[in-house]
Amino acid sequence: MTRSLKKNPFVAKHLLRKIEKLNTKAEKEIIITWSRASTIIPTMIGHTIAIHNGREHLPVYIIDLMVGHKLGEFAPTINFRGHAKNDNRSRR
């Protein structure tokens, strides 16, 4: 279910402050965050945000097509390595 339009999108306050500070300085640097639940808003476009996936921070460059999505969607937490090969020797 989607979020109600009466409510504003959730963005962590510390993340919003960092982005606004960089926008006023017109600087570009990597912003490290653990807030995977924050929604991407238009002021974030052009910044690189390092999103925590549970083990490390993955840098993600924000483009206009990402607006409205959550940060956690772009940092996968599970690394699927494929199913085990069919080994007939172990079945005997």
UniProtKB/Swiss-Prot annotation:
Keywords: Chloroplast, Plastid, Ribonucleoprotein, Ribosomal protein, RNA-binding, rRNA-binding
Keyword Ribosomal protein: yes
Top-rank lineage group of the source organism: Eukaryota
InterPro entries (alphabetical): Ribosomal_uS19, Ribosomal_uS19_bac-type, Ribosomal_uS19_CS, Ribosomal_uS19_SF
GO molecular function, one term: structural constituent of ribosome
Assigned GO CC terms: chloroplast; mitochondrial small ribosomal subunit
UniProt subcellular location: Plastid, Chloroplast
One Pfam family this sequence matches: Ribosomal_S19
GO BP annotation list: ribosomal small subunit assembly; translation
UniProt similarity note: Belongs to the universal ribosomal protein uS19 family.
Role: Protein S19 forms a complex with S13 that binds strongly to the 16S ribosomal RNA.
Protein name as it appears in the record: Small ribosomal subunit protein uS19c
Taxon lineage: Eukaryota, Viridiplantae, Streptophyta, Embryophyta, Tracheophyta
